[in-house]
Amino acid sequence: FYVVRDTFTSYISKKTLLPVYYHDGKHEDSYWSYSTYLYTDNGKNDSLHVNFEYIKRKGTSRTEFNISKKACDLVATCYKIRNLDVASMSRGDVAAFSLLFEDIVYELGLKFTGKENVKLKDGSKYRTSVFVPTLIKGDLFKNDEDLKVYVADDDNHYPVYVEASLKMGKAVASLESITGTKYELSGKKKK
């Protein structure tokens, strides 16, 4: 039995939609680590200054670097993805994005694979747009397309269901509730 208790927190500027702060706490079986990014926008160019701190059992490291304003952490990237114009995408289209992971920026893609109806454990049904992100091969995933993200097919584009094939099995995440959306929840189907 392998226990994973990861927490991800991100703050994004409402005005600029740029990341401001990110923190993660990873607890995976006996492994643990904490990462923090503090972003500074000097407003003069296309880059953000990042103060990065990484704490793990072996010690703490701190560094500073600049990244493009197009790059951001995992949670902020998910928010940016919610703002894609899915209506203009065709099956097989790839939206490019830049992901900051630890102190490296990865140029990745999000492939639109079509639309599907999804039924969750609680019996609720959703119309979804399905995306397969390009993944960073490593300890967790065998292949670069082992993750599927099902996003509500409405103007909110909130994640409904996530399915991941991992080296040690399978992980799923599903929506339990959602409130305070900007638009009507038209992606949820009537029972």
Write out the residue ranges for each language-model feature.
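Active-site/ligand-binding surface loops and adjacent short beta/alpha elements
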Residues: 41-101
